[in-house]
């Protein structure tokens, strides 16, 4: 698993703060002896500037991780507390560098070592959940990655369900289209049959009229024959 860039930057920033405290102590030891240490002063200034830039980078990384939901809100609060702790240390170190604040020994003792930083619970956190209490940062990172993976798996499952439902909807739509086509064909067939029935009815009516006309003609012909017969029949 790739290391979290935020924690990698945080670790290096803590090391810079530790180094600044040690070099301020060295400089003050020289000054107590009446000696000057210009090289140490220049180094400390550069380290303080580096510390400031690292803290700004941590703020940017944290804001990006929270805004893109790469970490949970709880983890975001946890990292913000660690970041606030670093900002406080930066102010103490700057004040000590200018001989305006606490002694560097006190500052140095307040800086967590790498082992304590990874093993002891953070005193700045309140109401730490039982799931993360006593865990080191590596373990917490793994736990956060596991949570993110579970969330991704849940989203994948949800996406699969939505895709299947969409496919079912398309299949139902296709089936409805086929049913509509069948209904249209039946309607056309009924219409054609009705047209044929009307045509046949007209033909039957015409035949009936023709049959009636033929009957009348036959009657007339018979009457004419009867008249002719009567006319030519000899009478005594």
UniProtKB/Swiss-Prot annotation:
GO terms for cellular component: early endosome; endomembrane system; endoplasmic reticulum; endosome; late endosome; perinuclear region of cytoplasm; phagocytic vesicle; plasma membrane. Ubiquitinated by HECTD3. GO terms for molecular function: chloride channel inhibitor activity; SNAP receptor activity; SNARE binding; syntaxin binding; ubiquitin protein ligase binding. Residues 233-236 are vesicular. It is a single-pass type IV membrane protein. Residues 42-65 form a coiled coil. It comes from the Eukaryota. The modification Phosphoserine is found at residue 160. Disulfide bonds: none annotated. Its main location: membrane. It is found in: Membrane. Keywords: Coiled coil, Membrane, Phosphoprotein, Transmembrane, Transmembrane helix, Transport, Ubl conjugation. GO terms for biological process: cellular response to type II interferon; early endosome to late endosome transport; intracellular protein transport; regulation of protein localization to plasma membrane; vesicle docking; vesicle fusion. The chain crosses the membrane at residues 216-232. Vesicle trafficking protein that functions in the early secretory pathway, possibly by mediating retrograde transport from cis-Golgi membranes to the ER. Forms a SNARE complex with STX7, VTI1B and VAMP8 which functions in the homotypic fusion of late endosomes. Part of the SNARE core complex containing STX7, VAMP8 and VTI1B. Interacts with VAMP8. Interacts with HECTD3. Interacts with TPC1. Belongs to the syntaxin family. This is Syntaxin-8. It comes from Homo sapiens (Human). The gene is STX8.
